[in-house]
């Protein structure tokens, strides 16, 4: 029962953050939530897991390099969090998404199979949204 009450209050906090994010607009919300996640994120127990994973990735990283990666990750989480409530905006507005080589996508409408591999910054759903805008059938797998 306590778990359900805890989840209820967590949901209220998330919804309030979404409402605030929607009220202040996407550009300001991205900045504020990047800073918020950067400030609050390291307080969670996942901090040790993140640090250990980076040590496994490369034991040659300096402390400042590791810290820079971790800070970038928390900022990215902040942007991703807030962008979920703006997915409808991204569907209508192309100016916020950039894709190098997007001219190559046009030639893919002849129903031949293709695999897209992407790097992403912030919200990873945006790539598939942009491809689907071009009327290309798409199945998406995230890992």
Regions inferred by a protein language model and the residue ranges of each:
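Catalytic core of membrane glycerolipid acyltransferases/transacylases, capturing the structured
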Residues: 112-143
């Amino acid at each position: 029962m306590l778990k359900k009450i805890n989840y209820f209050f967590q949901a209220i906090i998330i919804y309030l953050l979404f409402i605030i994010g929607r009220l202040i607009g996407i550009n300001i919300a991205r900045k504020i939530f990047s800073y918020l996640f950067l400030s609050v994120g390291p307080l969670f127990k996942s901090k040790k897991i993140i640090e250990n994973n980076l040590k496994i990735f490369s034991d040659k990283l300096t402390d400042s390099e590791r810290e820079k990666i971790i800070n970038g990750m928390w900022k990215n989480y902040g942007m991703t969090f807030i962008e979920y409530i703006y997915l409808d905006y991204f569907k209508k507005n192309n100016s916020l998404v950039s894709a190098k080589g997007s001219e190559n996508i046009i030639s893919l409408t002849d129903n031949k199979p293709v695999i897209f591999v992407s790097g992403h910054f912030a919200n990873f759903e945006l790539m598939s949204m942009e491809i689907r805008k071009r009327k290309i059938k798409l199945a998406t797998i995230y890992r």
